[in-house]
């Protein structure tokens, strides 16, 4: 597996790079890298073509609004059009929302805490999420269970565009994970690389495997 990692200048981005490198070969590019260079890097090698594989794109966390993050929005548009397996994390997730026609806005600053967030029906059907799902504690109500995750963000969304489906959300409706309905693209508002996401390494390993398994997935969608 080969990963093209777009660095959005987050302070802890190499924690995520190191975690990813346990599962795949990783090439890191700053978000100021020309789109043509990124497109070339995302082209399958001869060996990958023979094996029916192609690189996976990771859009890293970072500061600011996704539309101000170098060429991230442009390469994400390419990835969605060409159905390149893509994982967006924090700022990368927000880029997914904006690229699909949604709006990212202030939702209140949450920096450095673990939250238990509720899985949706679509979320519990994702193998990577069901593998780390926690049963409700006494007094909690969650039909499909919870996951414990690390939050470091002030922007987010409570409403997704039609092409995205929620996998997890906070008690007050902030979307914490989503997938594209027809492209192999998943986004996490939270940080799997943080020690405050206890099952983060397991989740990341599963997502990398799931996204590269079927490059042109098209699954049924839940409302």
Predicted feature descriptions by range:
Residues 1-4, 55:
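Extreme N-terminal starter segment of soluble prokaryotic enzymes
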Residues 3-20, 31:
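N-terminal beta1-alpha1 ligand-phosphate binding loop
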Residues 25-35:
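A short beta-strand-loop structural module common to alpha/beta enzyme folds
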Residues 35-53:
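Short amphipathic alpha-helix with an adjacent loop that forms part of the alpha/beta core around
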Residues 53-126, 131:
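Cysteine-nucleophile active-site neighborhood
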Residues 128-129, 189-198:
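Phosphate-binding/catalytic loops
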Residues 128-182:
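Catalytic beta-strand/loop cores that center a nucleophilic Ser/Cys/Thr
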Residues 195-223:
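Acyltransferase
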């Amino acid at each position: 597996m080969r990963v093209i990692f777009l660095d959005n200048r987050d302070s802890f981005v190499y924690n995520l790079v190191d975690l990813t490198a346990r599962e795949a070969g990783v090439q890191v590019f700053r978000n100021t890298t020309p789109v043509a260079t990124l497109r070339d890097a995302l082209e399958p090698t001869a060996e990958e073509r023979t094996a029916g594989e192609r690189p996976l794109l990771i859009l890293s966390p970072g500061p600011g609004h996704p539309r101000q993050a170098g060429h991230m929005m442009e390469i994400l548009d390419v990835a969605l059009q060409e159905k390149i397996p893509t994982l967006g994390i924090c700022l990368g997730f927000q880029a997914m929302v904006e690229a699909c026609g949604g709006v990212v806005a202030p939702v209140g600053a949450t920096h450095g805490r673990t939250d238990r967030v509720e899985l949706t029906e679509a979320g519990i059907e994702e193998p990577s999420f069901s593998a780390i799902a926690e049963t409700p504690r006494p007094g909690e109500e969650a039909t499909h269970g919870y996951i414990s995750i690390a939050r470091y963000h002030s922007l987010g969304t409570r409403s997704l565009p039609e092409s995205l489906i929620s996998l997890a959300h906070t008690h007050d409706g902030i979307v914490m994970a989503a997938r594209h309905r027809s492209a192999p693209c998943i986004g996490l508002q939270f940080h799997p690389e943080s020690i405050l996401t206890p099952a983060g390494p397991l989740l990341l390993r599963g997502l990398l495997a799931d996204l590269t398994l079927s490059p042109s997935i098209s699954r049924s969608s839940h409302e």
